Amino acid sequence: MSKIVSRTVSSIAAALPLALALIGSSASAQTLTPQPRTLGIYAGINAGVGVYEWDCGTSCGRTAFSGKLFGGKRLTPGLAAEVNYMFFGRVDNANEPGLAATTNIAAEERKASAITLGINWEVELLHDVTNHLRIGVARVKREQDIARPSGAVESVSSYRTAPHVGAGLSLQVVRDLRINTNFDYIVDGENSLYLFSVGGSMEF
């Protein structure tokens, strides 16, 4: 009996290193197996404050609730082609009689929207914290409701093309979810637009 037990123990002892090696090899293979790749497509929504660069009269507003929808396709791990749709809330202006007579504008309301196309360059600053730099071109639509001193009211729509630049930070909350803060600037002289916003994005 003792010989049988001894042989059994010896067999187990001989097989144990091989079993441990196989287990270790399996665990190593699982560790080295890459995570399933995403499609490299992301989309998000932000809300915040929009600012109009507006040489307006004696009583005017330049800020309004605004926001943007955005999405992109990664070209490399740190570079993506991106499109944004930005909407800027309505602001208004009222001129004093003297200025109204000079400009032929008694009061005015305006709002704007823009579609931008450009690139999003990402640089990881810290673990899960990424810096975003954006550059592109914007197609801007402006809508104005103008009240003339005579009492007439007219609506005017116009389109302009202008450069778009932006910067921001994002924090990766989970693997495919980020929260972000962004600054966007549509560079168009006295018609420039600014957007300060926060929001989130998902990657697919």
Regions found by a protein language model. Give the residues of each.
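Short glycine/proline- and aromatic-enriched beta-strand/turn motifs that initiate or cap beta-hairpins
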Residues: 25-81, 85-87, 115, 121-124, ...
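Extracellular loop and loop/strand-boundary signature of outer-membrane beta-barrel proteins
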Residues: 55-58, 101-108, 149-156, 183-186
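Residues that define the transmembrane beta-barrel architecture of outer-membrane proteins
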Residues: 39, 61-67, 111-115, 159-165, ...
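Outer-membrane beta-barrel "beta-signal"
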Residues: 42, 171, 192-204
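Gram-negative outer-membrane beta-barrel proteins
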Residues: 51-57, 89-95, 139-147, 187-191
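Cleavable N-terminal export/targeting peptides
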Residues: 1-39
